[in-house]
Amino acid sequence: MVTIHNLGFPRIGRHRELKFALEKYWSNAISQDELLQTASTLCKQYWQNQNKLDWVPVGDFSFYDHVLDMSFLLGNIPKRAENLSDNELDNYFRVARGRAFINESERTCIQAGEMTKWFDTNYHYIVPEFSQETNFALQAQRLIAQIRQAQAQGVKVKPVVIGPVTYLWLGKSKDKINKLDLLDSLVKVYTQLFDELVKLGIEWIQVDEPILVTELETDWQVAFRKAYDILANSPIKLLLVSYFGTLQDNLSFACGLPIDGLHIDAINAKDEVQLLIDSLSDDKILSLGVVNGRNIWKTDLSTTLLWLEPIHQQLQNRLWLAPSCSLLHVPVDLDSEQELNDDIKSWLGFAVQKLEELSLLAQALNQGQASVTKEIANNIDAINSKKYSPLVHNAKVKERIAKVNDELGNRQSDYKSRTKLQSEKFNLPLYPTTTIGSFPQTLEIRQARHDYKLGKLSAEQYMQTMRSEIRYCVQVQEHLGLDVLVHGEPERNDMVEYFGQQLSGYVFSQFGWVQSYGSRCVKPPIIFGDIFRPKPMTLDWITYAQSLTNKPMKGMITGPVTMLNWSFVRDDQPRATTCLQLSLAIRDEVLDLEKSNINIIQIDEAALREGLPLRKSQWQTYLDWAIRAYRVSANGVSDETQIHTHMCYSEFNDIIEAIAQMDADVITIETSRSDMELLDIFDEFDYPNEIGPGVYDIHSPNIPSVDSIVELMQKAAKYIPIKRLWVNPDCGLKTRHWDEVNLALTNMVLASQQLRKN
């Protein structure tokens, strides 16, 4: 009999119930008990959704981030937060979000933990912090409470934890300690945890070690053997879980670890399955991730079964089936969608549907395909409908793609020639100030957008409301003394969705939300077909904003690589081809802005780095087509037009040469959480163009002081000539409140003025 299980379920709720509860709690609108009740209700719903599974993951729920949960479970709490008097949950949120100075009686100020991408996804985790003083201590109360709640509901529980080697690999040393020196003390705490789980009657534990799909150095492979030789002494059965790629050179040693089962991502590592079967001993389970946990397309059940049947014959009861990875990365339930085109909806599957597919696969293997004849036939119809649909294919787009050449990606002159012309045109001071694009999305803005969608506001009324917001943004920026302005993006719900809604080849869900970090959710658009731009997308808003000021106004566009990486992407052609289609559509927009005298244009590539394959040996192929797509989108303009790009959360040191090849006149980057550490690369690499290192963390409510900004920029000036430095926040300001924005930007402008005097 085939066993089916899941690796993780979306946390946020069908209608983002967790998001709204968190934000109410943070604003003191509900009590902690009410927040905990929301979490309890959601967990019960999740477990009910998974009631056909043989093993259900528990411990995958999180109030903010599962890596931060692991840090607290292991007692690895940053010293700046460990001695606060409030309860554990509030301390947890302070590490995640930071805490500003409030008043004289409550002086505690906490810096937020550093946040970075979870492997190559659009999820962000709070980076564990290590030092010579790190002392692990088991604090498993929250996990144990979840397990007991699930057991009381009759759930067959499989707890989920991040494995010890991956946990160390994900973290950052604060004093240059070798992270692997902490392995022995860390494994002791895992042993204690497993002992506690045995007392709860737990048979299997899921231990996530996704770094198995990366290129591990020998010392990390040795660490695996060392850790699992100890953990194998526990009576609990260990399911070692990898995902997001292939094992390759880690396959042999992973199969030889003293574990009871191994899960692989069979979507990406299908070619390794037979070698795994041959390499695993006969007493070990092989779990195959056969349903894609990263995308929203239906599984081709017929083709999958054809492949699985001989494997089932070989493995029999040793075969487990699961999604390729946690379903954290897909929306909750397709049945919530009532407005999607019927054909397109028939091609999709969200988390609930993926578990149904898993159940059908198991039934077909265990009871024969005759038991699911109707379901298989319906699935075949949907797969064929997508393959041949005229909604998907556009001959004109394919013809334009065929004509793309390298010349399209080249500027007329090099940066040194361009910057002279741009300096004369804009006449900006040293340390010019700007923001990244968005300003606070107030309740009034969201309400207007909502009413417009429902038809309660006419197009004219909506336009006037948005223009009023733009006017206010421009007035605020002029009053603050910023040098290069933005229109504030009140008309944009999301930087990808806004553009996708205006491009053919995209479709949008109502409730297709996924978690990005904490309470921040995104609704990735769905690329189902060939992409083109029917008409200008930003022109009216930007030109209106420019009419309100004599200062330069930045045009704001999301770049092709970010559009791709933050969308659910069609799976019937190479991603590089889809990205090039996007770049041509964006190029048309850039040229229209320039024709309308918008001569500073920012093309955001916030997600460039997250598209990198997890194995460095595969990076160059990705970077070649990604940088080409960016250059095609940006480089049709004249030398006087200044092109900016922005990258948030991008640890770009190892791709700095590729970023330089983008040839943007100005790049703005996230650096404040890392204390300008990201700029170390410029000791070795002479970056030729202009840079705006972010001077404060917009994800935290903390207000930066003038002195802190001056200090950060002085650090930056050690690496970059001051004539090529800009002053800006880390990222857009849409999630902040106006009072925070005004205070922070006031200090930023004052700091810039002080720097000019020096």
From Swiss-Prot:
> Which reactions is this enzyme annotated as catalysing?
5-methyltetrahydropteroyltri-L-glutamate + L-homocysteine = tetrahydropteroyltri-L-glutamate + L-methionine
**Listed GO biological process terms:** methionine biosynthetic process; methylation
User: Which terms in the Gene Ontology molecular function aspect does this entry carry?
Assistant: 5-methyltetrahydropteroyltriglutamate-homocysteine S-methyltransferase activity; zinc ion binding
The metabolic or biological pathway listed in the UniProt record of this protein is: Amino-acid biosynthesis; L-methionine biosynthesis via de novo pathway; L-methionine from L-homocysteine (MetE route): step 1/1
Q: Where does 5-methyltetrahydropteroyltri-L-glutamate bind?
A: 16-19, 117, 520-521, 566, 610
Which parts of the sequence bind Zn(2+)? 646, 648, 670, 731
Q: Which residues bind L-methionine?
A: 436-438, 489, 604
Top-level division of the source organism's lineage: Bacteria
Disulphide bonds annotated for this chain are none
Keyword annotations of the record: Amino-acid biosynthesis, Metal-binding, Methionine biosynthesis, Methyltransferase, Repeat, Transferase, Zinc
Summarizing the function annotation, the protein's role is: Catalyzes the transfer of a methyl group from 5-methyltetrahydrofolate to homocysteine resulting in methionine formation.
Sequence similarity: Belongs to the vitamin-B12 independent methionine synthase family.
Identify the PANTHER family for this entry. Answer: 5-METHYLTETRAHYDROPTEROYLTRIGLUTAMATE--HOMOCYSTEINE METHYLTRANSFERASE
Protein name in the entry: 5-methyltetrahydropteroyltriglutamate--homocysteine methyltransferase
Q: What is the lineage of its organism?
A: Bacteria, Pseudomonadati, Pseudomonadota, Gammaproteobacteria, Candidatus Pseudothioglobaceae
